[in-house]
């Protein structure tokens, strides 16, 4: 009896040292999973599409919430650092579009491939880079994911090919990656992303044709955030049904503000490609809260009321949060704890990104050759020999 009382006393003493919210979360019984209805996708040249119900586990829900919050807070910190002139040059933020980058990653395998345009910070994080490496890249430091030489538009990770600065230029490259997957006999797909503004580029239609001709495992994905720079889709495109643009390629129009919709559509599209049927096209209807880039205030071609309406009615993070709380997958207190942890991670990363040294000037010529060339290469400074991977 004494031993039992002593054990109870130790447990109570330990609980007393923890915040009340943590004790409450630890003692509460949560559901392991829940089933949700999701919006039906519009289909093109498909007899059936992704399911309209899906199961979300508590583990996955917490993971998705943390990932989306991290991307959101990272982008807001980048905005702050840019306004302090610590980050310079081009910078395109993706806050508001978190369900796209996290949902796409949730629907594929780590061995699958992804290439996108210049709004790439979220994808870089989801493909495996730490926040500190991304922010350090934005500030041009040695600890950046491209060693401080790529900046906002040119970040890379394993099976992630950027970050590309030329509008639409990544789409033929994505088709080429899909060709490599098929040529090497690998059960892999390539997610090839572009925006609604780039959707009118001629090279995209050329890539459609080759991918369909050779039945490449390529998922063409149009992130339709309604505006190409400052031009609304209605003013730029004769048809805004981007999921039908492939004509002879099947297509899906997906609610890009709902991570579960994006996840299920991506799984469906990946399975279609892996079955050997060829490419498929996805249009993700989403919205960016910031302007096109940091030089764009974002309110000259749309109203503040429009932005606020999307924030209040369709925010991807709030949608997931409400689902999890209302279905007993998580508590408000638990999600607030994640928010606190994410904010600390972002602040620590920002400190690293401002304190880490810049790369030395001679490193400008590094990483041009895959291996050290057998001859001396002279650049602007004839006494510096360019190196490769060092």
Curated annotation (Swiss-Prot):
Activity control note: Pyruvate dehydrogenase activity is inhibited by phosphorylation of PDHA1; it is reactivated by dephosphorylation.
Main location: mitochondrion
Tissue specificity remark: In all tissues, but in very low amount in testis.
Keyword terms, alphabetized: Acetylation, Carbohydrate metabolism, Glucose metabolism, Magnesium, Metal-binding, Mitochondrion, Oxidoreductase, Phosphoprotein, Pyruvate, Thiamine pyrophosphate, Transit peptide, Tricarboxylic acid cycle
Entry annotated with the keyword Disulfide bond: no
Matching InterPro entries: DH_E1, PDH_E1_Alpha_Subunit, Pyrv_DH_E1_asu_subgrp-y, THDP-binding
Modified residues (N6-succinyllysine): 63, 244, 277, 313, 385
Cofactor: thiamine diphosphate; Mg(2+)
Gene Ontology BP term (one): tricarboxylic acid cycle
One GO cellular component term: mitochondrion
Reactions this protein catalyses: N(6)-[(R)-lipoyl]-L-lysyl-[protein] + pyruvate + H(+) = N(6)-[(R)-S(8)-acetyldihydrolipoyl]-L-lysyl-[protein] + CO2
Post-translational modification, as annotated: Phosphorylation at Ser-232, Ser-293 and Ser-300 by PDK family kinases inactivates the enzyme; for this phosphorylation at a single site is sufficient. Phosphorylation at Ser-293 interferes with access to active site, and thereby inactivates the enzyme. Dephosphorylation at all three sites, i.e. at Ser-232, Ser-293 and Ser-300, is required for reactivation. Acetylation alters the phosphorylation pattern. Deacetylated by SIRT3.
Record PTM N6-acetyllysine, positions in chain: 63, 244, 267, 313, 321, 336
One Pfam short name: E1_dh
GO molecular function: metal ion binding; pyruvate dehydrogenase (acetyl-transferring) activity; pyruvate dehydrogenase (NAD+) activity; pyruvate dehydrogenase activity
Residues annotated as binding thiamine diphosphate: 118-119, 165, 167, 196-198, 225, 292
EC number: 1.2.4.1
Transit peptide per record: 1-29
Sequence positions bearing Phosphotyrosine: 301
Domain of life per record: Eukaryota
Role: The pyruvate dehydrogenase complex catalyzes the overall conversion of pyruvate to acetyl-CoA and CO(2), and thereby links the glycolytic pathway to the tricarboxylic cycle.
Subunit structure: Heterotetramer of two PDHA1 and two PDHB subunits. The heterotetramer interacts with DLAT, and is part of the multimeric pyruvate dehydrogenase complex that contains multiple copies of pyruvate dehydrogenase (E1), dihydrolipoamide acetyltransferase (DLAT, E2) and lipoamide dehydrogenase (DLD, E3). These subunits are bound to an inner core composed of about 48 DLAT and 12 PDHX molecules.
Protein name: Pyruvate dehydrogenase E1 component subunit alpha, somatic form, mitochondrial
Organism: Rattus norvegicus
């Amino acid at each position: 009896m004494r031993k039992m009382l002593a054990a109870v006393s130790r447990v109570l003493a330990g609980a007393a040292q923890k915040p009340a919210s943590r004790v409450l979360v630890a003692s509460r019984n949560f559901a392991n999973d829940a089933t949700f209805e999701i919006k039906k996708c519009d289909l093109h040249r498909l007899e059936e599409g992704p399911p309209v119900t899906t199961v979300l586990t508590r583990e996955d829900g917490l993971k998705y919430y943390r990932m989306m919050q991290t991307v959101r807070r990272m982008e807001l910190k980048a905005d702050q650092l840019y306004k302090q002139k610590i980050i310079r040059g081009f910078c395109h933020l993706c806050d508001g579009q978190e369900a796209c980058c996290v949902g796409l990653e949730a629907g594929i395998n780590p061995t699958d491939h992804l290439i996108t345009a210049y709004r790439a910070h979220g994808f870089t994080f989801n493909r495996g880079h730490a926040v500190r490496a991304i922010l350090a890249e934005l500030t041009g430091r040695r600890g950046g994911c491209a060693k401080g030489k790529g900046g906002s538009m040119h970040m890379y990770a394993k099976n992630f090919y950027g970050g590309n600065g030329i509008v639409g230029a990544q789409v033929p490259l994505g088709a080429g990656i899909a060709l490599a997957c098929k040529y090497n006999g690998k059960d892999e797909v390539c997610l090839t992303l572009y925006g609604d503004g780039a959707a009118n580029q001629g090279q995209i239609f050329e890539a459609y044709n080759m991918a369909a001709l050779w039945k490449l495992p390529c998922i063409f994905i149009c992130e339709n955030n309604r505006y190409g720079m400052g031009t609304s889709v209605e003013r730029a495109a004769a048809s805004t049904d981007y999921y039908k643009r492939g004509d002879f390629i099947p297509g899906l129009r997906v609610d890009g503000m709902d991570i579960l919709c994006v996840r299920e559509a991506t799984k469906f599209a990946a399975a279609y490609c892996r079955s050997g049927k060829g490419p498929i096209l996805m249009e993700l209807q989403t919205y960016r809260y910031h302007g096109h880039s940091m030089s764009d205030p974002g309110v000259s071609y749309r109203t503040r009321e429009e932005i606020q309406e999307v924030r209040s009615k369709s925010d991807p993070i709030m949608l997931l949060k409400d689902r999890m709380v209302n279905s007993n997958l998580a508590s408000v207190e638990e999600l607030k704890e994640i928010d606190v942890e994410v904010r600390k991670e972002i602040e620590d990363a920002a400190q690293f990104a401002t304190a880490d040294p810049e790369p030395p000037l001679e490193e400008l010529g590094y990483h041009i050759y895959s291996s050290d060339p057998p001859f001396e290469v002279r650049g602007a400074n004839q006494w510096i020999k360019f190196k490769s991977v060092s």
